Amino acid sequence: MRVTVLGRLGVTTADGHTLPLDGLPRRARQVLCVLAARYDRPQSKDALADAVWGEDLPGNHVAALEHYVSLIRRTLQPGRPTSESFIVTRAGGYVFTTQRAGLDLAELRAAARAADEHPAGAADRLRLRQRIVELAVDLPFGDDEYAEWAAAPRAEVRQALLVALSELAADAVAADPARSLRLAADAVALDPYAEPPYQLAMRAAAALGRTDDALRWYDRCQHALTDELGVPPSAETAALRADIVARRGQAAAAPTPAP
């Protein structure tokens, strides 16, 4: 089976059948998500309860937690012995083991680490970056985006996706500027205060012959950085704008070929 947490929580069987999660109460889904966020690391019952309930612990939080884990096991792996569950009882707590269930968050993290081991621009590095883009249909734990336990994995996925989009956009500028522009635009949407994606969008738009569009990307960058953060675009971005303007002027001044 495979659990997905990038975006909304989902579970599929080995044959690709999607399991309905309507029978799991919200607290049970939260328990599953916390275990997924901390996969392959045993969690004490107190730590899990603190993540799920915070200061609003039920009267007997240990019993409540045990009930929800039992419900998760019965719902997602009916008929399977507890000893074979992907949620393993260990050291008085529980652990989501990726040896018994796939997890998209773990796959993304592995792809990011593997990509970093290859040199910039290498085909294998770009293939792994593309895999990250395919996996990260959205940031993880969308139903609990403001939960403290979700903050770290959400930030990690955002950064991994930003790097993947940026590297893929940079690689495509010359060969496929339209794709490069789409990827750069996605990177800007993901982090409007990161400057390199704006530079990539400017380069891609210019490569498409859309000079005005390229300059509008600079204006968006300037608005995000100057108006909202109080800092100007970098000298590199300003120089890129100047180069685009100069090339537009040269194109306008070029003589029209005789008929």
Label for each model-derived stretch:
Residues 163-164, 168-258:
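Recognition helices and adjacent regulatory flanks at domain boundaries
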